[in-house]
Structures are given as structure tokens and as C-alpha cells.
């Protein structure tokens, strides 16, 4: 298990999670066999890493310690994390560093666009840290990144995974107006866990955010994801599904929570593959166009393939409705 120190940047001396340093170590459960993944060693992984470093980019794959980094980077898939690597929030589950962020890098939109073109991406996912310090929460920067990618690689479809833009009037409208192909905002966990797991956020604000996207652009695909294994009850997960469907969300992802350090929220349970399959079945019955539910599912895992299936599912639904 990694320590509280920054383990992403080998030269860093700062504490990665200062707000968690005073906490007692939590119990660490042994991972079941279905969670284990191979260490990244492939040529494709090395090439992707080189491109990321060349353009001085940050990826959520590294910062969040994603277990799928070896598989995704081998295929030259990466999720770019814009607006720096320091977040203004301190969620109990997240491995991204907390603190006072640096000023925005004005060259970042062009650098991201160059990397997308160089990697030949047909679909790209752009996420960010929370930037509560910015007047618009980073909405203009998202807009610039989307525009830069459109200019450099017009055929690439763009998926964004945004923060909640809490108390940032007009921010959401600006991002939606930039016309990403998929708007993703993760609920992360059930309503009853928000005070302990996601204390800086508001459950119904996030639901309303996703609903508002559809009001602004009914044709835009919306997506959200949660982690399980944080002590939630099954009925709470089903209620969250209902809340997302009320907001007309198209795509739901469900994955196992994995504890980054002993200072983070403990894993309360490892949900079995059969339970994930059951959640998938129920979610489809509630009307989601696309559901990805498995222990290693993450928001941007297989995002390009999933987008193709999502688009096909909508076309099929429209054809059926027209008959």
C-alpha cells in the first residue's frame, strides 16, 4: 500500500494528501482474484507514456492510480486531466493530490490537441481536477480544449468528464455550448455516503447538473458513474439509478472502489462479478441506453468502443419508436 507522500512525481517532496495525514490508518482488505491486473510493461504503454510526457500533460490514469492503465496505454488510449494535477476538493476516495492549484497553463489546449492527433485517437476523454478557485470553475478552459481538439483532429469524438461546477453560474452552459459528444459527470457514490465520501459535493446538485445538460442540448449523450464497495446498500444503488433516469442520463458505469492508501476511505466490501452483472441487468431494465458494470469498470475504460455502442443503441431506439 502506498504512503501519503506523492508517489506519482518521484521528485516531489510535498505531502500528496495533507488533509488526510492526521487520520489513523484504515484496514486494508486483501483483493480477490478477480481484481488482479498485470503490471504495465508493453511497448504501446511506453510509447503512450512518452507522448504524454513530451507534451507535458497530466493523465487521470496516473494521478488516480487506475488499475487499467496498462491495458489502455498499450492501445494508446489515455484520459487527459486538464487544469493541473492539484485539486481543490478532498474526497475520501480519490488519489488525486489536494492543495492550492497553480495557474492555468494557457498552452495546454494546444498541447492536448497535438497529443490527440499524434496518438491517432478516434475518441478522447478529457477530465479535470476541481478548480473551485476559478471564477468559472474552469469552464472556459474546457471550452478551449474542445475547440483545439476539433481544429487539430476533426474526426475525433470528444467525451468530457467534468467537476460539478458548484456555485459557478453559467459554467455548465458554456461547456455544453462547446458541443462535446458525451457529457460525463460522475455521481461517485450513493446519496447516503456523500457526507463521508464526497463531502465537498451535493448529491442533488449533481443530479440536476446532468438533467440540465439534457435541457440545454437534448441530443447530447450524458453519462455518469459510481463506485461500489463503500458500504452502500443495494436499494441505495437502485434509487441512484432511478434518480439518474429521472435526469434522462443515457449511460451508467459501475465499478469496484479500490483504496489508494491507508489514509483513504476503507473498502467495505468487494462486490462479486455476479452482483455487478445483476446491477447491469437492472439498469438496462430502467431504460439506460448503455451500462458498463464490472469490478474493473472505470468511467473512461473502453470509452471509444462504448461510445460506438451507445450511439448504435440510440439509433436502434429511434428506429423502434418510428415504427
From Swiss-Prot:
Cofactor note: Binds 2 [4Fe-4S] clusters per subunit. One cluster is coordinated with 3 cysteines and an exchangeable S-adenosyl-L-methionine.
SMART domains membership: Elp3
Metabolic or biological pathway: Protein modification; protein lipoylation via endogenous pathway; protein N(6)-(lipoyl)lysine from octanoyl-[acyl-carrier-protein]: step 2/2
Cofactor: [4Fe-4S] cluster
CDD domains per the UniProt record, alphabetical: Radical_SAM
Radical SAM core domain ranges (all copies): 73-289
Residues that hold [4Fe-4S] cluster 2 according to the record: 87, 91, 94
Annotated GO CC locations: cytoplasm
UniProt-recorded name of the protein: Lipoyl synthase
Gene: lipA
